[in-house]
Amino acid sequence: MDNNGVKPAVSAMEAFEKLEKVGEGTYGKVYRAREKATGMIVALKKTRLHEDEEGVPPTTLREISILRMLARDPHIVRLMDVKQGINKEGKTVLYLVFEYVDTDLKKFIRSFRQAGQNIPQNTVKCLMYQLCKGMAFCHGHGVLHRDLKPHNLLMDRKTMTLKIADLGLARAFTLPMKKYTHEILTLWYRAPEVLLGATHYSTGVDMWSVGCIFAELVTKQAIFAGDSELQQLLRIFRLLGTPNEEVWPGVSKLKDWHEYPQWKPLSLSTAVPNLDEAGLDLLSKMLEYEPAKRISAKKAMEHPYFDDLPDKSSL
């Protein structure tokens, strides 16, 4: 291994047979592939190295070190190996070799929507518990995901195991919170402080996304589906009420704060009608305006909503 923990190895193309392209992440293509030596099916994430870059991009190195650190948790997709290869132009490419998981939450939700069925409540509960558990592990190790969405929550349909993937934008955060760049998260799952231009944020950005995913599992529709940053904010305000200094101290000082239409909060049950009382209570704690007041992943696991989940320790 060299200093970066990247193994110069058999070229990835000699070691693997690409079966199909399964996606395109922010930093490169993802293939389903077979390891020739063992026959094992894996996910190969090919990371592009930009023309002007000497060596491996820092985003990739960061992802590798974070994933190696987090690989112990069953709810984080496992990074099994890193291989270097050379592409047709003679440029270095990196292949991250991940365990292969057969579907994701976006496809899972879509299959129920298309069938006109609800996802069974105990399934929602089981998936949410695993998501909270995986995020508690990330946050406990000082890692924010910052791009949680159904598409990067992988799922094994047979075992109903959920695994958090695509920690590409994650960066280890240490207290005090550093200033962060803005280019994160799909709009629908983006926390209001990010939409309003906050430069210091914390685990609350992930917990907001977890809340949005919770609501979507129950209704099969995104709870806040905006097509611009402004529309996204207005959708949130229409349901939760327009925030003010009383409910969210400091909100009017945020960079992108303006005077917005004044909406009164509606009951969450209007947006998520078939969620029980304990579920609505947990959801309201995840969608709390003031980031520091948002429930933590660890606390969420102890919420009464999960009380009747059988055998939590096996999840």
Curated annotation (Swiss-Prot):
What keywords is this UniProt entry annotated with? ATP-binding, Kinase, Nucleotide-binding, Phosphoprotein, Serine/threonine-protein kinase, Transferase
The catalytic activity, as recorded, is: L-seryl-[protein] + ATP = O-phospho-L-seryl-[protein] + ADP + H(+); L-threonyl-[protein] + ATP = O-phospho-L-threonyl-[protein] + ADP + H(+); [DNA-directed RNA polymerase] + ATP = phospho-[DNA-directed RNA polymerase] + ADP + H(+)
- Residue ranges of every copy of the Protein kinase domain listed in the record: 16-306
Cite the active-site annotation.
147
- Phosphotyrosine: which positions carry it? 27
The UniProt annotation places ATP binding at: 22-30, 45
Q: Which GO terms describe its molecular function?
A: ATP binding; cyclin-dependent protein serine/threonine kinase activity; protein serine kinase activity; protein serine/threonine kinase activity; RNA polymerase II CTD heptapeptide repeat kinase activity
Give a single Pfam family match: Pkinase
SMART domains, per this entry? S_TKc
Expression by tissue, per the entry, reads: Expressed in flowers.
Residues that the record marks as modified (Phosphothreonine) are 181
Recorded GO cellular component terms are: cytosol
Q: Which PROSITE patterns match?
A: PROTEIN_KINASE_ATP, PROTEIN_KINASE_DOM, PROTEIN_KINASE_ST
| Catalytic class of the enzyme | transferase
> In its UniProt record, which GO terms are filed under biological process?
hormone-mediated signaling pathway; protein autophosphorylation; regulation of G2/M transition of mitotic cell cycle; regulation of meristem structural organization; regulation of mitotic cell cycle
InterPro entries xref list: CDK, Kinase-like_dom_sf, Prot_kinase_dom, Protein_kinase_ATP_BS, Ser/Thr_kinase_AS
Q: What is its EC number?
A: 2.7.11.22, 2.7.11.23
Family membership:
Belongs to the protein kinase superfamily. CMGC Ser/Thr protein kinase family. CDC2/CDKX subfamily.
Q: This chain belongs to which protein, by name?
A: Cyclin-dependent kinase B2-2
